């Protein structure tokens, strides 16, 4: 059994994935890179929503940092979009196939109940520590677990970025200049999210911590 962090794709993302694989299976001459690009852009947006936006939404409405952190999330999304637009370019169909192979083999996973998820593999240690910490929060020990939450969700962020920003982009034909931009952007996003976690979590009362961790608990699964 392997552990994953995974969110349910939107109807638009799921339909785009299905259409792309139908075209590939039928050896259609239609351009695959158009679908790769749309899938990549939607995945980036929906991953950010799962990782950070839900955390911000868990804050009390009168939180003094909530509005600022919403802007921070928008900055991260803009940074990601800029990198994606830099990396993606018109590509021959045969050269796009490695990206779809990666998605098929390492991203698309089903829960034990058969629900499709856009997924990131987690080490057993990280997954079990996350679940144990979440259970403690749900048991009323949120304040005691704040530092563990900050540390573990920082590790989760890094795992997601490693999977999509580093591993996935290895399937793209990039020149040295474009490839050099990846670790720079990775570092920026990690730093911004780490700062956000350190500002957000200590502000959250027990009720908010329970709501926030319940959301993430449902995103960790094994198969």
Range-by-range predicted roles:
Residues 2-223:
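Protein-protein interaction and targeting regions used for scaffolding, dimerization, and localization
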């Amino acid at each position: 059994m392997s552990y994953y962090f995974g969110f349910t794709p939107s109807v638009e993302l799921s339909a785009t994935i299905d259409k792309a694989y139908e075209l590939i299976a039928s050896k259609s001459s239609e351009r695959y890179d158009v679908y790769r690009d749309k899938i990549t852009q939607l995945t980036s947006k929906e991953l950010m929503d799962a990782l950070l936006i839900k955390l911000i939404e868990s804050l009390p409405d009168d939180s003094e940092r909530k509005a600022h952190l919403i802007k921070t999330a928008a900055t991260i999304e803009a940074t990601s979009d800029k990198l994606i637009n830099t990396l993606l370019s018109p590509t021959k169909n045969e050269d796009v196939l490695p990206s779809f192979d990666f998605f098929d083999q390492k991203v698309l996973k089903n829960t034990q109940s058969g629900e499709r998820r856009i997924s990131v593999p987690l080490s057993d240690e990280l997954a079990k520590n996350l679940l144990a910490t979440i259970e403690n929060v749900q048991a009323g020990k949120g304040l005691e677990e704040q530092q563990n939450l900050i540390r573990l969700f920082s590790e989760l962020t890094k795992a997601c970025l490693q999977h999509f920003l580093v591993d996935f982009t290895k399937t793209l034909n990039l020149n040295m200049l474009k490839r050099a931009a990846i670790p720079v952007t990775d570092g920026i996003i990690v730093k911004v999210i780490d700062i956000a976690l350190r500002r957000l979590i200590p502000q959250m009362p027990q009720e908010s911590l329970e709501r926030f961790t319940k959301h993430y608990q449902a995103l960790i699964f094994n198969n």
